[in-house]
Amino acid sequence: MTVGFDYWQVISHYPDYFRQLADMHREAGWKVVVISAVGDRTAGTVEADVRRLGISNEVEVHEVKFEHPREAPELKVAKCKELGVSVFYDDRDDVCRLLNANGIVAMRVTRQDGSTYDLGSERG
């Protein structure tokens, strides 16, 4: 099986937890991937950020590029399907709802700042 994690507001804000969770999944024989929706400002930065937080080099890092953050749900679903992801952790309700509607178990991560507005959560 394959498990996926979002970067921003997930790994970025809970690095110790998600590093351990990724390691546990890998030790159990699962493939682990990071899928992050990015805009122009953050494109090309996610892998370095993920590695800096101690996520194993065996974890694949994928960026999906949006023109507007509202495109993130569809982009993440498409990448999850391409990679065979069966479980995905994300902070956005709209992403989680669309993942679930497409047969992918989505685990919603509460943001540390308590915000819930999906489009305001992206780094751009």
Segments and roles (model prediction):
Residues 2-71:
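Alpha-helical substrate-recognition element adjacent to the catalytic core
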Residues 24-25, 79, 98:
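Alpha-helical scaffold elements within enzyme catalytic domains, especially in hydrolases
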Residues 83-124:
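Acidic, Mg2+-coordinating phosphoryl-transfer loop and its flanking beta/alpha structural elements
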Residues 60-84, 88:
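Mid-chain, well-packed structural core segment of small domains
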Residues 39-44, 67-74, 94-99, 121-124:
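Low-complexity, flexible helical/coil segments
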Residues 1-3, 85-86:
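The start of beta-strands in P-loop NTPase/AAA+ ATPase cores
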